[in-house]
Amino acid sequence: MAAAAQLSLTQLSSGNPVYEKYYRQVDTGNTGRVLASDAAAFLKKSGLPDLILGKIWDLADTDGKGILNKQEFFVALRLVACAQNGLEVSLSSLNLAVPPPRFHDTSSPLLISGTSAAELPWAVKPEDKAKYDAIFDSLSPVNGFLSGDKVKPVLLNSKLPVDILGRVWELSDIDHDGMLDRDEFAVAMFLVYCALEKEPVPMSLPPALVPPSKRKTWVVSPAEKAKYDEIFLKTDKDMDGFVSGLEVREIFLKTGLPSTLLAHIWSLCDTKDCGKLSKDQFALAFHLISQKLIKGIDPPHVLTPEMIPPSDRASLQKNIIGSSPVADFSAIKELDTLNNEIVDLQREKNNVEQDLKEKEDTIKQRTSEVQDLQDEVQRENTNLQKLQAQKQQVQELLDELDEQKAQLEEQLKEVRKKCAEEAQLISSLKAELTSQESQISTYEEELAKAREELSRLQQETAELEESVESGKAQLEPLQQHLQDSQQEISSMQMKLMEMKDLENHNSQLNWCSSPHSILVNGATDYCSLSTSSSETANLNEHVEGQSNLESEPIHQESPARSSPELLPSGVTDENEVTTAVTEKVCSELDNNRHSKEEDPFNVDSSSLTGPVADTNLDFFQSDPFVGSDPFKDDPFGKIDPFGGDPFKGSDPFASDCFFRQSTDPFATSSTDPFSAANNSSITSVETLKHNDPFAPGGTVVAASDSATDPFASVFGNESFGGGFADFSTLSKVNNEDPFRSATSSSVSNVVITKNVFEETSVKSEDEPPALPPKIGTPTRPCPLPPGKRSINKLDSPDPFKLNDPFQPFPGNDSPKEKDPEIFCDPFTSATTTTNKEADPSNFANFSAYPSEEDMIEWAKRESEREEEQRLARLNQQEQEDLELAIALSKSEISEA
């Protein structure tokens, strides 16, 4: 009872108010205790046998007081519920979840015990049955049955818990076919209404609720009944129609079943609790015994409806209704005596069996111990053999490990030696890494500025792309006209040959008549020169400069960068180039001076720069293609374009502040490593052509017929003495900027090649000019050594932007200031920027000259770049031929 005392009333009742209701029925005076007579009368309504009820009473009244308090009465109710659900009647079953107990009550058929007669009236009244049938018909049954889907909404409308509705469905579906007929539906609705009236739903269907059509016959077959009747007649010696316990004791014990099971069968069959069995009850008892012996089926705790003898079905309901409220648990004295004897025999039997079991367990234990010891000895022997084999293997492995140890020690020495070398290498690499990190920080700053410049250029590129798109739109109507003009071009070929001869003749005559019509600084209008036939050849040679003008802003900070013609190869005589261009312009102007047709390619002068102030040059009045043949004469057939000296003109660096220094940075040098024996030792002009160190890429420079030194303003007249690069006799440059860009707002502007080193009056007027030869892009200078290369310089798309020989002082954001080591000049002292005298020891320091591999790499890049430029020039030549053809076609149209 200690376990029961620990349980509270809520735990015992599982929160069900039915337990409290039952207690109020017994303890009507609310005294807090229940007498034995009241408890016996109430517990008899459960329908359990007296033996089970007596056991329940003993478990509930552990103190033997003869009364029960509220908690003890709840324990008794809980044990009754366990017995009704087939569980063991013990205190350990109190913790199991069971439905509330069921007791007989005339007011509710749900609380009637499982024992019921076949003749019992159906609990569903006729008027209720009619109402339930109407609901059944409204649900449209199929073949007299309703499926669960149709019954489910009706049950859910009751608002009952789902578990209660599930139990109602299981109880009403008697044949378990998943559907309900009329009688089963009536049972379901009856249970729902009872549940709505707060009556508990039973765990099993009471016999009174079983429809008459579903009730079964008696379990004892007629053949068995006849056989058991013969045994009954032999046993009933007094011939009173009943047999007592003493009369059937020997027959029951001969079956070999336990006495407790026989007593349970006796209590089930003695439905009237009179201590005797009738003929039908005796047949039922033997039927239960035979079921246990043959099929092993245990007798139920409560008789099912089909087990109740037919003779007892009619009188059972009357006995239940009219039963006395007071009952005695030991009413049958003979049964008690028999039970006591059975208990004594069972106790003695249990003691003997216990002793025998203990001895058998001892024997088994000893045998098991011996067997375990034998197994252990066998295992140890096996383990010993394994260990010996392992010992041999380990010894062999140990010998191998000793050899490996010696080898590893030698390898360790070598590895340590290598580690020392690697550590030394790592230290040197760390030092180099530190220097590289500092350079990287510098490069990152330069990269940020370069990105800003890139964004600006990208914006300008977008604007230029829009202009190109608009130009393409204007070009589309001309393409159709070009197809028509190509046929005319073939007919013009012969005419062009005649015009070339006439052009050469006119150019010589016009040169004499217009000696002052030369180009100054290349600042002339594109429209005034576009009609010249010599311009077509120049356009092809300066396609790179034209592309640079289109991709960069019109006004540049450095004059050298704004003009793509400032870096031609030194092999061209600038005076001859200038005079040739001027001659072509003059000849075309004279031939077309009186033409009255309008030039279709003429651009409004308001969008261009002003022409050269010469009254003889009329660039805007006539069509250059009318009246003369620009291809009549060959401008390259008579004059050698390589006959002039590109350095014979004026000094273009005289206006720079760097070249106006009063001191000579090379004057302090005692000896000039580049000077000859004396000034008079210059052998010939041809020798100087081959020895010119300033010729780009080592190409041959045309000999100069002038004695002027364009570098005299920078290095002085006495720095080199006589011999190599003596430019002391060169004249001073004019104050005009020779690198001024000649740009125009027109997209098709082209800058004509001009000699930036030439003064305006150097060339003789009598000498006829010649057109300049095709000038390639100047060879780029040799790259710096690998350790001193500039990333910006190598990655820059403009090869002249960072290595411009004509830019004396870079700006504040120049890479030279950010990394002076990369951009150092081997010919300049470290203190040049402070205008101090140069250190002679640092002059011409070639210690940092690139290696042969760098020279090969540089030559490879130069070769690739020149190939790209050659292809670009070919494309430009094709474009110019197209434009020339269009111009010729337009001129033919205008003449017509």
Swiss-Prot record:
Protein name: Epidermal growth factor receptor substrate 15
Subunit comment: Interacts with SGIP1. Interacts with HGS; the interaction bridges the interaction of STAM or STAM2 with EPS15. Isoform 2 interacts with HGS and AP2A2. Part of a complex at least composed of EPS15, HGS, and either STAM or STAM2. Binds AP2A2. Interacts with AP2B1; clathrin competes with EPS15. Binds STON2. Interacts (via its SH3-binding sites) with CRK. Interacts with SH3BP4/TTP. Interacts with ERBB2. Interacts with FCHO1. Interacts with FCHO2. Interacts (via EH domains) with DAB2. Interacts (via UIM repeats) with CORO7 (when ubiquitinated at 'Lys-472').
Keyword ATP-binding: no
SUPFAM superfamilies: EF-hand, Myosin rod fragments
Gene3D superfamilies noted in UniProt: 1.10.287.1490, EF-hand (1.10.238.10)
Native organism: Homo sapiens (Human)
Binding site for Ca(2+) 2: 236, 238, 240, 247
PROSITE patterns: EF_HAND_1, EF_HAND_2, EH, UIM
SMART domains: EFh, EH, UIM
Domain EH: 15-104, 128-216, 224-314
Tissue: Ubiquitously expressed.
Superkingdom: Eukaryota
